[in-house]
């Protein structure tokens, strides 16, 4: 009698275990037949039952099913599109399931790349959507998840894109340490695919600026040198390194690199713009005559442009400011009065020249269409402010009034 009771108990236990195993099998079958609702119901039971929740297979199919729900939710052409609203949290659940499967799968018997790819792409797309609406913190959360997931999916290209977005989010959040965290590994890469190079131009420039702001001379040079090594075909790399050498006092090396950039771009369609960048290097080294010659050559090649006009205006304004600083350091002796008068005349001459170039720059932006004006709004604002300062310094108050009104209008629109 006892043997019969024991046999019955074991039989009952076996049926219970098999019933739970059948939940996984049922989920697999329903998934193959396209019944996502039934597959989800079956796998959810298996994921919480004691007998199947520690089985890697359970979590593999959970990840797969939730990925299919994601396919229905994100692809209007999906054969599962009628299930698009089946579970709005499909992405998080698919990710958690895949990670649980990875944890339990001691033999790497399950290929999770599809699940990770689907989840990673979803996080990435969400991060772009949030970034474009200005929600940088939530965009960062999603792009960070995307990078981690996509590294598991075997998609390094989209993982790099996600890391780039993470760094850009930190930049918009003014979190320099966050930028360094994400952009640092990108800077250290030795090979960059062509379609990612425009991103890397931004990465190198931003990292250079952060290190310069932090007065980290070693990393300023290292970042610029890495740029020239990894992307030697990009003249911007030589110009960035030239700027680094100016900053560290090596003016001869800076000029050498500026000349190299000029030679590399001489026969390119954008040569006039490159000349302005080269002129900026000469200006920083104190060779104002060569800088002016480069700006004017650029204007001759392309008369209707912003860069040469704003570049010349900025250089002249800086030279006027230097004269002003020298005036402020003088005393009240007769000799100082003579020097002050001479310096004031030189300052005013620079300001009057700057005014003409600033007017041309403003005229250029004003002639653009709405999109062009929006893109150059910051340039316009800076030109207007500089022009207004020129007028005030020269006591040209009537000329200042309409310029100040435009500045106020721009500032009001930004608030």
Task: Indicate residue ranges for each PLM-predicted region.
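Start-of-domain marker
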Residues: 20-74
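Structural register within alpha-helical repeat arrays
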Residues: 26, 62, 69, 119, ...
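Short coil/linker segments at helix-helix boundaries
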Residues: 65-133, 151-157, 191-192, 198, ...
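Residue-level recognition of tetratricopeptide repeat
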Residues: 53-55, 159, 193, 200, ...
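TPR alpha-solenoid repeat register
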Residues: 56-58, 155-156, 162, 196, ...
């Amino acid at each position: 009698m006892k043997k019969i009771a024991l046999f019955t108990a074991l039989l009952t236990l076996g049926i219970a275990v098999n019933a739970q195993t059948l939940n996984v099998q049922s989920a697999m079958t329903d998934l193959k037949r396209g019944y996502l609702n039934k597959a989800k119901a079956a796998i959810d039971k298996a994921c919480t039952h004691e007998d199947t929740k520690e089985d890697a297979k359970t979590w593999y199919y959970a990840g797969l099913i939730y990925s299919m729900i994601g396919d229905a939710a994100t692809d209007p052409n999906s054969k599962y599109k009628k299930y698009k609203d089946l579970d709005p949290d499909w992405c998080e659940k698919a990710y958690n399931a895949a990670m649980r499967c990875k944890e339990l799968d001691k033999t790497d018997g399950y290929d999770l790349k599809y699940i990770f790819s689907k989840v990673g792409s979803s996080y990435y797309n969400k991060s772009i959507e949030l970034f474009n609406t200005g929600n940088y913190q939530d965009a960062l959360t999603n792009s960070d998840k995307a990078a981690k997931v996509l590294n598991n999916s075997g998609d390094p290209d989209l993982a790099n894109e996600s890391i780039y977005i993470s760094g850009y989010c930190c930049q918009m959040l003014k979190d320099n340490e966050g930028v360094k965290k994400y952009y640092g590994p990108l800077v250290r890469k030795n090979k960059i695919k062509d379609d990612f190079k425009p991103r890397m131009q931004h990465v190198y420039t931003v990292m250079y600026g952060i290190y310069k702001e932090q007065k980290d001379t070693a990393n300023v040079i290292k970042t610029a040198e890495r740029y020239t090594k990894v992307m030697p075909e990009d003249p911007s790399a030589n110009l960035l390194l030239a700027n680094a050498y100016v900053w560290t006092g090596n003016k001869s090396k800076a000029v050498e690199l500026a000349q190299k950039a000029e030679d590399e771009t001489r026969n390119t369609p954008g040569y006039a713009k490159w000349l302005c960048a080269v002129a900026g290097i000469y200006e920083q080294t104190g060779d104002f005559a060569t800088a002016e010659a480069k700006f004017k050559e650029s204007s001759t090649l392309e008369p209707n442009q912003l860069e040469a006009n704003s570049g010349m205006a900025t250089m002249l304004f800086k030279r006027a400011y230097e004269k002003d600083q020298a005036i402020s350091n003088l005393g009240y002796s007769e000799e100082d009065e003579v020097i002050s008068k001479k310096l004031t005349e030189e300052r005013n001459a620079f300001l009057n020249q700057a005014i003409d170039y600033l007017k041309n720059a403003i005229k250029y932006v004003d002639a653009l269409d709405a999109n062009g004006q929006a893109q150059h709004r910051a340039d316009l604002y800076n030109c207007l402010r500089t022009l207004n300062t020129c007028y005030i310094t020269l006591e040209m108050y009537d000329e200042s009034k309409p310029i100040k009104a435009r500045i106020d209008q721009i500032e009001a629109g930004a608030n």
